[in-house]
Amino acid sequence: MKKSTLLMAAALLASTFNAHSEYYWTNISAGDATTYAIRNDGTLWTCGWNEKGQLGVPSVKERTATFSTVGTDKNWKFVEGGKAYGFLIKEDGTLWAVGTNTDGVQGTGDGIDHKTPKQVGTDTDWAYVTSVRFWGYTALAIKTDGTLWGWGSNSSNQLGTGNTGKNETTPIQIGTDNNWKTVSMGVAHTMAIKTDGTLWGWGNNSSGQLGNGTQTSVTTPVQIGTDTDWSYVKAIDNRTYAVKTDGTLYVCGSNAYGLLGLNQSEEELISNYNTLTLASNFTEKVISVSGCENTTTFAVGENGIISKIYTVGDNTDGALGDGNGKLLTATSSSDEMPRSYTLVEPLLPEGLNYSVLSSGQNYSLAITTDGKLYAWGRNKGGQLGDDTDVDMLPTSIYKKPVLIPCPQTEIDASVNTVLSDNTVRFNGSTLYTTEPIQNVSIYSLSGALLKKANTVEQTWTVDNLEKGIYLLQYTLDGKPNTMKIVKK
């Protein structure tokens, strides 16, 4: 036994300390209160709330501020966080869903929640997916052939099928066009751009968010204006942000709290815009927009590189990142929260450039061009990934951006750090198990037995171990298992 353990330890030691570049983040998406991130080795990591299993890590009971890897696959390409659900695309073009399946939002057709990623159908040509995110249970996706597909709730015609109120539990093609380029969803409306540069919209239009000059809702895609130079569009809540090829920003819909970014004072504020209106106060080219129902973040720069970030709106739980936020408690009111009707800048370090900006419910995440992650705002579910203890999370906020380290744990698929079904997981200090495991032992890499238990149910802390790499051996369902763990 000891000899085999020593041999395995030697092999693991070699693989662990193989020369490799420092791990860094390449993509990230803020859901309602759950964060999905991809590391440069293609592994998927999550943190935040897990009430519907949306982390893809069943061992997390409710929430966590520690990034955990979802399985050991190293071919994740794209992530999209929603309202207690997430969508994921792999390099092979397969689409996966995790979390709640309310209204058929996962597109899996089985009507059940999934606590680990579940493949959506068998197609291998998915290119992009978006969702209603914080407000409901609808998703739309574009395939590599340019066709548009949707599923989930269609309560406000946000799917664009024309079948008002008819939910779809599996992907259904929207029309027959095959030249869709990008698509984005608000609370109940959808905006999209075709490869010919035309802008389209459908669904709810009660705030003028479609930008067609009316407040009349539509059931299927309609072209917005006649321009053919649109390059980017973002739908957020009841408002829309569209960018032309020259980087100019046009906005429409609800302008509560100045969320359209027009830099109007509270006294000057116009509540709604029914047509796309130029945001002439932006002197830099706008690259992307993100936000929630009461906050908007704008990314500006050149050639896809973000050089500056602006925020506007409500500053609950530090959402604006300017240092002036306030904690929302059970006894306080949203009316007491500070807000800015004009653009402010989060207190990010000077001189940095960014590749990704994503905002969730009162929190934001920005990845620098060299893969570092800065985060600010609400952290009550651990969605910022800062390793805050669970007991401290109910009051955890960051009024200004903080650097969130990327986990450096080596993920080796040949010796699982997590069983494929997520039965057993180690978060750096505690072993979690969804089923009882027996004959549990922890060995040093030299083969010395350091800790032992006959049976472990749910949790087993190893705080007495020094920081380092160890071997965990245990029996599950009569079968022996070995996994590498890293004590933080």
For each feature predicted by the language model, list its residue ranges:
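Sec-dependent, cleavable N-terminal signal peptides
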Residues: 1-22
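An edge-strand/N-cap motif at the start of beta-rich repeat modules
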Residues: 19-52, 67, 72, 375
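Conserved core positions of repeat-based scaffolds
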Residues: 28, 34-37, 46, 85-88, ...
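Short loop/turn segments immediately following the C-termini of beta-strands
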Residues: 33, 40, 49-51, 84, ...
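Short glycine/serine- and acidic-residue-enriched loop/turn motifs that recur at repeat junctions
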Residues: 47-66, 98-118, 152-169, 202-220, ...
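Thr-biased low-complexity repeat/linker tracts and other Thr-enriched repetitive architectures
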Residues: 92-95, 143-148, 170-176, 194-199, ...
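Blade-level signature of beta-propeller repeat domains, shared across WD40, Kelch, NHL, RCC1
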Residues: 358-409
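C-terminal outer-membrane/trafficking sorting elements
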Residues: 415-488
